[in-house]
Structure formats: structure tokens, C-alpha cells
Amino acid sequence: FELKYTENHEKVFYDSIHFFDDNLHGIAVGDPTQDCASIILTSDGGNTWNKIPCSKLPKFEENEAFFAASNTNIKTIGSTVWIASGGKKARILKSDDFGDTWQIFESPIIQGEGPQGIYSIDFADKNNGIAIGGDYSKPEENLRNKAITNDGGKTWLIVADGQNPNY
């Protein structure tokens, strides 16, 4: 074991880590320590990691964060990465260039409170994806917790509203 990255801040908490298909580029995401997500990147297989400055990231809303959902809130295909958020807002962060530049897209998934938002995201290809979430304080509810996209995450459509699966 060899320590490759350290960050000292009272709010530091990294939720997920994922490597791209080339096994050189990697990304780890964490809750905001300022008004943006905490995202670190590697391009050398994890030997060195660098935090993206807030000036290069979309601004997060207060109480918007990521869920540590068994590492399923990140998806990569080729050089593209999608990351799902929750809490105050349930949005999708997207980069097409290994995390160098970013866009952020709204979703219709339930949001507004701490336990609400997107927990998991997956894509079959660079256009077709699914997001699932809900409200973990109300595990029996299944409203506004599943959405699909066919344009790479720019727009989302609620599906199977009121049907299982629940959160």
C-alpha cells in the first residue's frame, strides 16, 4: 500500500472512484468542500492525482452532493464520464474529454431534500442511459425515481412512475 493522494479539509469525503477503459485515466468524486464538487483525476493509472479547481467545474447548489451508492454514481464510456448528484438538486455532470471540461444537466428525479436524488447511473452507449434514485428516507415510494435519456444525458424522461423498483 502506498498513499497517492491526500487532502486536508473538514468536509472531505470521496464517494466513488472509477477508471476509464484505457486503465490510465481515473476519476474520484466527493462531496463539495466549496461551491463545486470535489473531483480528482489521474492520467497515469493512479500514480498521481490532481484536484480540479472550482473554476473549471459547474457550480453546485447548497446541499447538493453525491451518494456513496456502491460506486454506481459514475459511468464511463471511452473518454466520456457521467456523474449523478442528489440532495438539493438531482443533476448529471458530464465530460467528454476525461474530465477536462464539464457540463451539467437537470433531471426530473425527485430532489430538494437531503435523502433525495440520483443514486445510480448507467449508459448502454454514449446516448442511451438510465438514472435511478428516490428518497432513501421513504423506501416504499417509487415516484419520480427512474429516468432515461437518449441524447447523452442532456434531457431525461421519467419512466415507470409509481411502479417498482422503489428507491
Feature locations, PLM:
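Residue-level recognition of a conserved intra-blade site in WD40 beta-propeller repeats
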Residues: F19, T76, D122-F123
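Entry beta-strands of beta-propeller and related beta-repeat scaffolds
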Residues: N23-A28, T80-W82, N127-A131
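Asp-box/BNR beta-propeller loop motif
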Residues: F1-H9, I40-F60, L93-G112, Y136, ...
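Signature of short aromatic-glycine-proline-rich micro-motifs recurring in repeat-based ectodomains
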Residues: F66-N73, I118-S120
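Short glycine/acidic-enriched loop and turn motifs that connect beta-strands
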Residues: P32-C36, K88-A90, Y136-P139
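Oxyanion-binding "anion nests"
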Residues: Q116-I148
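A generic, well-ordered mixed alpha/beta core segment in the N-terminal half of proteins
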Residues: F1-H9, Y14-A28
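Repeated scaffold domains used in trafficking and secretory/extracellular systems
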Residues: V12-H18, P115-S120, N166-Y167
